[in-house]
From Swiss-Prot:
The modification Phosphoserine is found at S150. GO terms for biological process: viral budding via host ESCRT complex; viral translational frameshifting. Residues 14-33 are annotated as: Interaction with membrane phosphatidylinositol 4,5-bisphosphate and RNA. One of its GO terms (molecular function) is zinc ion binding. This is Gag polyprotein. It comes from Human immunodeficiency virus type 2 subtype A (isolate D194) (HIV-2). Residues 191-228 are annotated as: Interaction with host PPIA/CYPA and NUP153.
Amino acid sequence: MGARNSVLRGKKADELEKVRLRPNGKKRYRLKHVVWAANELDRFGLAESLLESKEGCQKILKVLEPLVPTGSENLKSLFNTVCVIWCLHAEEKVKDTEEAKKLAQRHLVAETGTAEKMPNISRPTAPPSGKGGNFPVQQAGGNYIHVPLSPRTLNAWVKLVEEKKFGAEVVPGFQALSEGCTPYDINQMLNCVGDHQAAMQIIREIINEEAADWDAQHPIPGPLPAGQLRDPRGSDIAGTTSTVDEQIQWMYRQPNPVPVGNIYRRWIQIGLQKCVRMYNPTNILDVKQGPKESFQSYVDRFYKSLRAEQTDPAVKNWMTQTLLIQNANPDCKLVLKGLGMNPTLEEMLTACQGVGGPSQKARLMAEALKEALTPAPIPFAAAQQRRAIRCWNCGKEGHSAKQCRAPRRQGCWKCGKSGHIMANCPERQAGFLGMGPRGKQPRNFPAAQAPQGLIPTAPPIDPAVDLLEKYMQQGRKQREQRERPYKEVTEDLLHLEQGETPHRGATEDLLHLNSLFGKDQ
């Protein structure tokens, strides 16, 4: 530990703590960063003592420089730390890591005598105009050469498929990553997809269908002269029966070039669009705003579904103008209708910015509470018809009994006598509905007795009614006799043998038994 601390001593250690990790940042370098750099040097087979001098730091930078473009984050951090330590040994005052890297870069260029510059780690730049950059086919010395796709491009494509799972973003992402690719490179991208093999099979079927259509539209011409390049077939465009050199020659031959890469990309885009519809079954007609959903979130979902729809631009424009307002919730729809005909999206987002949020809900609740607490206005005619308040204690109008200053009336309020209350007053007259309200007469009165000598106007009773009642009584008696138990009948028979008189109806029961069993029974 002591040897590692001896890398920077005294003034150099103080200067190290003044250097910022990032431009305009708050964090600064500490001795722990030097200790970490010494530990990392062991991984590269470099001695820790190299950090103690300016020449040693230069040797470290020469070793690390070729590894920086493709190195890990730890390697880049080690390179930055060594640059700062080199500046401290060279007594160069720097404010942050970026300045230290620039100074170290200038020194290495001057020492090697070349005009090459170290790659900028934190700020990657775009390739100069006129050069291929990341394109698989590049021109060198008048000839077209093939450069394989970088692992970074393939990794970006695989991450796009895994994260979006064939969402609407996959199609434009594939277009951007496969720009300028040959069928060989595009097949590499498709082969890197491990999951979602069902979607890959759909894409293969689309490729086979498009290749068959290409062969039908471009028949094979007659025999070609020796050495002449043949025209591509559907399988050649798909990259199964053609080589990379043939694909490049078809793409850049003069005259009559055939862009096999763009044709193959178009076929795969058709397959990807079908996969997008399969993995996103939500129809744009079903995208509706929830009662508590913000209008901005609803617009995002609407345009995401609209992006997955593979329809004509005119149809998409109609969907935007019609369905966007039609499927909004009632609160936003009320606001949008007040904007007039064909409002812009910016106007709609601005108008519905607070609709559906907590502030709008609180405002509506406050208005509803205010309306509930506000008394309803009484019409003038109804106010004129309302009777004045009358005091039941003194009988005057204009105040109630609670506000009356007169002495409280004693005794019964009905008759004025003491010893009972109005509820028990004998002078009150009540019907079956009780006493009348507020000392008034009851709502019904006992029926008065009819005066003597009046002749009823109802017709006399019909004699057939009496005859019907008589028949009903006889039938009732017969049913009772039939329902008598056998025990009672035998008791009546014993009474007859003993000379006693049985109850009524017993003789008839015995006659029935004689008719069944005869006289000997």
